[in-house]
């Protein structure tokens, strides 16, 4: 059983998608947040999942908060740490502790547009496709090995909000499948590439 801790900062719609997918061999040990008011905490608690908030305002400095979050996550001894709308950059020591065990979903087709404001940046650059990326987390922001990507068209009439809504629908499909592949032992990392045993026979040929 793949014991999983999910980190969120807001409503956690991707977390909800993972929970509702009822993924085989996955047990969600906890949903944690840096925001005590995160709506996703109440939703997870309503599903009978253990929740906790680690509020950075309760700590004198960022290093102390980071240590508290690391210790809280480690206390659950997870096989997988899932970032589902967690809006803080993980410190290097966290990335080292849970190397090859931490997965993030990012709202762009990496390596394009790491960081914030991805949808507006895609529009501003004239992209005809946008999307999302599920990847393993490393200390270098949004640069870890890519597990899966999903794309949507960018329309001339799009705003950042309309594009974000279209991408989010793909996120809700892509992340549960990637988590299921992790839990099934389908994923292996070779340098910057992730090989997926489930899709190994796909060649792209008709």
Name each model-derived stretch:
Residues 53, 60-78, 87:
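Glycine/small-residue-rich loop that forms an oxyanion/phosphate-binding "nest" at active or ligand-binding sites
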Residues 1-43:
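N-terminal Rossmann-like dinucleotide-binding module
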Residues 81:
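Structured binding elements
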Residues 16, 189-206:
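Short, basic/aromatic-enriched C-terminal tail that caps enzymatic domains
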Residues 47-48, 98:
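Short, structured coil segments at secondary-structure junctions
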Residues 21, 34, 84-196:
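Donor/substrate-binding cores of folate-linked one-carbon enzymes
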């Amino acid at each position: 059983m793949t014991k999983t801790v999910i980190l969120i900062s807001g409503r956690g719609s991707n977390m909800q998608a993972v929970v509702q997918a009822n993924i085989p061999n996955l047990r969600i040990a906890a949903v944690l947040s840096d925001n005590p008011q995160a709506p996703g905490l109440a939703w997870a608690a309503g599903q009978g999942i253990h929740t906790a908030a680690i509020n950075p305002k309760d700590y004198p400095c960022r290093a102390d908060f980071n240590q508290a979050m690391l210790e809280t996550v480690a206390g659950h001894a997870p096989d997988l740490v899932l970032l589902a709308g967690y809006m803080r950059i993980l410190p290097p020591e966290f990335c080292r502790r849970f190397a090859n065990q931490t997965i993030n979903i990012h709202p762009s087709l990496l390596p394009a547009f790491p960081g914030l404001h991805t949808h507006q940046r895609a529009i501003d650059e004239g992209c005809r496709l946008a999307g999302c990326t599920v990847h393993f987390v490393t200390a270098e922001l949004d640069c870890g090995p890519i597990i899966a990507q999903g794309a949507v068209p960018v329309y001339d009439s799009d705003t950042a909000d309309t594009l974000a809504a279209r991408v989010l629908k793909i996120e809700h499909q892509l992340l549960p499948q990637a988590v299921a592949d992790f839990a099934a032992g389908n994923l292996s990392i070779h340098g910057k590439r992730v090989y997926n045993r489930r899709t190994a026979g796909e060649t792209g040929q008709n």
